[in-house]
A protein has these predicted regions:
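Mobile genetic element proteins and their domesticated derivatives, centered on retroelements
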Residues: 2-4, 41, 67, 84, ...
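Catalytic-core regions built around general acid/base machinery
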Residues: 93-101
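RNase H-like polynucleotidyl transferase catalytic core
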Residues: 25-31, 101-117
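Short, glycine/acidic-enriched loop or turn micro-motifs at the edges of active sites
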Residues: 7, 87-88
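Extended, low-complexity cationic-aromatic segments
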Residues: 1-68
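RNase H-like two-metal-ion nuclease catalytic core shared by retroviral integrases
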Residues: 36, 83-85, 92, 107-128
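C-terminal anion-handling pockets and recognition modules
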Residues: 118-155
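Short, basic/hydrophobic alpha-helical segments
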Residues: 62-80
Length: 155
């Protein structure tokens, strides 16, 4: 089972343009921070488990709460959780609660998002959201809708 967090904010625009060969394209982009919606979930055999959205970035307390309350109750003893090396994924408490559930934590090599299968889902999910921002009253509703429509979002 692959676990990861991701996030998006509503200023993620990618301007495109043309310029002379050898010249860098420049575009004006606001440096103002906007609302960031993040999420965490697990992927097992092509299905998302325990998706949770939140405002801001993930930290150890939030990750531990998600493990205890959302993910571990859905797992069976012997399940393996594959996760990246984010510093907030590592603590003695996290190791203990995973072991108590009869599961194992396997850490991916440093800087290897290509080995985490859920990263490919995040790419598709973010593109789905970018294409539909204007259809929603607010940004958070767009993110929540993406998870509700997950079976239709992913090939």
């Amino acid at each position: 089972m692959y676990v990861d967090e991701a996030g998006i904010d509503n200023r993620e625009e990618y301007p495109y343009g043309y310029c002379e060969i050898g010249q860098r394209f420049h575009a004006l982009k606001s440096g103002k921070r906007t609302e960031r919606v993040s999420w965490i979930a697990a992927l097992k055999q092509g299905n998302l488990f325990a998706p949770m959205t939140f405002i801001g970035s993930c930290n150890r307390d939030l990750f531990q709460m998600w493990l205890e309350e959302c993910l571990l109750p859905q797992l069976q003893p012997g399940d393996i959780i594959i996760i990246d090396n984010a510093s907030f994924h590592r603590s003695q408490t996290i190791d203990e609660i995973v072991a108590k559930a009869g599961c194992e934590l396997w850490y991916l090599p440093v800087y290897s998002p290509n080995l985490n299968k859920i990263e490919h889902w995040w790419f598709v999910l973010k593109n789905w959201m970018r294409q539909r921002w204007d259809e929603f009253d607010n940004f958070r509703d767009c993110v929540d809708a993406a998870f509700k429509h997950c079976p239709n979002v992913f090939p």
